[in-house]
């Protein structure tokens, strides 16, 4: 069974639509929705604010496990379906394979730094914080490079492997995180610079805070500029350097 829908969150002028597709490995018995406590078992569509959602019922046996996988897109339901097929199609319904893949992807990042000495607790704290230092960078483009810009237009990235990121404002990352990212993962740092230049290409300005791939009034400083300069100073320059200078100067 496959269900699809969308949501429109609004916050700090960062309005955007999230489309999603959800697929389960067993046919459902029934489907329903609820809005602020009112349950409707006859409708597959619901509108409203606050407490709103949908549910599926199944005939199950004791101990039976039902698996569900989802994908999202900020472009369309069709794009969400494409993301689901590309990102999870190779795994089928093998949960352990998906988990192993996720573990290996994070291991690639965390293993860029090896520490010596200290206790197991010290190591656990270090790698937990290293993990957290990467968590606020969120990919907003689809597997084929499509995304919705700050003017609600669908754009196409030249290289889908270098995605557009919606994230916080790189707030005070010049104190330590810029250096960490550049030294530990220069390839990821380069992608972040490319993402900022994509904002400049389609919007005309670098974003102070790009949550939801929007221009946000969250702060008045330009903390993205020290990140771009830090990348350049460390030899991370696999992007249009002249365009980067133009964007920073503007």
Region spans (language model):
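Beta-sandwich/jelly-roll carbohydrate-recognition scaffolds of carbohydrate-active enzymes
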Residues: 1-165
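Aromatic-rich carbohydrate-recognition surfaces in CAZymes
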Residues: 166-250
């Amino acid at each position: 069974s496959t269900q699809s829908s969308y949501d429109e969150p609004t916050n700090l002028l960062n309005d955007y639509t999230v489309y999603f597709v959800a697929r389960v490995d067993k046919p459902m018995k029934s489907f329903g929705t609820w809005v602020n406590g009112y349950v409707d078992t006859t409708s597959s569509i619901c509108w409203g604010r606050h407490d709103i959602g949908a549910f599926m019922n199944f005939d199950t046996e004791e101990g039976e496990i039902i698996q569900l996988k989802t994908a999202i897109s900020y472009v369309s339901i069709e794009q969400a379906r494409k993301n689901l097929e590309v990102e999870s199609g190779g795994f089928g319904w093998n949960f352990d394979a998906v988990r192993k893949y996720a573990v290996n992807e994070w291991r690639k990042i965390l293993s860029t730094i090896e520490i010596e000495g200290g206790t197991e607790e010290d190591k656990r704290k270090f790698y937990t914080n290293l993990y957290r230092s990467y968590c606020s960078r969120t990919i907003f483009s689809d597997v084929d490079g499509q995304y919705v810009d700050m003017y609600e237009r669908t754009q196409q990235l030249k290289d889908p492997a270098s995605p557009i990121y919606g994230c916080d404002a790189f707030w005070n990352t010049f104190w330590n995180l810029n250096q960490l990212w550049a030294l530990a993962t220069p390839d990821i740092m380069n992608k972040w610079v490319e993402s900022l230049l994509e904002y400049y290409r389609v919007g005309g300005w670098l974003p102070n805070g790009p949550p939801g791939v929007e221009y946000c009034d969250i702060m008045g400083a330009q903390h993205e500029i020290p990140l771009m300069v830090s990348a350049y100073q460390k030899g991370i320059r696999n992007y249009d350097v002249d365009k980067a200078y133009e964007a920073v100067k503007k």
